[in-house]
Amino acid sequence: MTIATAPAPSPTPTPVRTAPRLTSGHLKRWMPWALLGASIVLTGLVFALVAVAGDTGFDLTGWLVVSAIVYLVLITLISGLVEGRRKAVDRFITGIVTIAFLIAMIPLVSVAWTVIANGLARFDALFFSSSMRNVVGEGGGAVHAIWGTLLITLAAAIISIPIGLMTSIYLVEYGEGKRIARGITFLVDVMTGIPSIVAGLFAYALFALFLGPGIRLGIMGSIALAVLMIPVVVRSSEEMLRLVPNELREASYALGVPKWLTIVKVVLPTAIAGITTGVMLSISRVIGETAPLLITAGFTDSLNLNLFDGRMQTLPVFTYTQYMNQGIPPEAYVDRAWAAALTLIIIVMVLNLVARLIAKLFAPKTGR
């Protein structure tokens, strides 16, 4: 007797679970920009309708803020639906960082635009070729203030850069762990935060001891600015010197090179780009000072190229005096003040460009 056995049922195949994808789609490259434009246009229409209905002015600040909020909401929701939660969070954070950057740029762009728009009225050849001697009302220029700014700042740099650089070399190369180095660092940190007027009073008191009260000299202004520059040069140069790898120093010592020559030939060339940037930052910090120069260098309407004889005027002081001592017509004085401010900004920009060029030329070459 043959017994037929039914075949065993085959096991039900277990469905293979696919790993979840990080993103289920991707927004087109133009989509974020389209959402930004739509947010700006739609909120602008709403604010315009509100302004017309309420007979009020257009709220520019509110429009920009609401546009940013609407954009963040839209880009997060749409990205979450199309690309997934991870990408949506990434786009949300990117939007916040971008908006923060734009907000930080608003004051800079506003200041630059205001100075350029108002300073071009007197940005002419007469402004750069004449002084204010015997000038009342319209006309005149700021050639005496431009030369005063350059000479006083140059003298301050000549005084402060060697002192600051040598101090930073001592702190990094010779004073590591010493008590005197800690004391110098503490004093430098304190000097970094002193008000500029204190530096002016110090320079005035120093020269008044030898030349009597009431003295005003260009070199006094240079001393005051040097006091403000030294701590900035020290701190920036110190940080750059500490970034030089110790392996470079040890390799030089292994070849029998003395310490001072290692500093000159290895350490300083390696850090020259950062040191130059720090020096230019210190110059940019002091070139616009007004209070210490009012006390030390004073102000004058004539051109004076001698730092050790007579008063000198700088562009910040020229701007202050023109704005505060307006005559008839007042527009002429205000225009000269704006032109001086624009000239000062251009000088700072040129100095920074020169610093970048110097840093690029003298930076250590990489590669073979």
Which residues does each PLM region occupy?
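Interhelical loop and adjacent transmembrane-helix boundary motif
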Residues: 293-345
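Generic hydrophobic transmembrane alpha-helix motif, especially the helices
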Residues: 189-225
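Periplasmic/extracellular loop-to-transmembrane helix junction in inner-membrane transport proteins
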Residues: 12-25, 49-60, 76, 80-99, ...
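Cytoplasmic-entry segments and transmembrane alpha-helices of multi-pass inner-membrane transporters
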Residues: 26-27, 90-95, 163-203, 230-239, ...
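Short helix-to-coil transition segments within interhelical loops
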Residues: 173-174, 241-245, 251-261, 265-271
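Transmembrane alpha-helices
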Residues: 159, 236, 257-297
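Transmembrane alpha-helix signature in integral membrane proteins
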Residues: 63-71, 140-169
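C-terminal transmembrane helix and the adjacent membrane-cytosol boundary/short C-terminal tail
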Residues: 241-242, 246, 253, 324-368
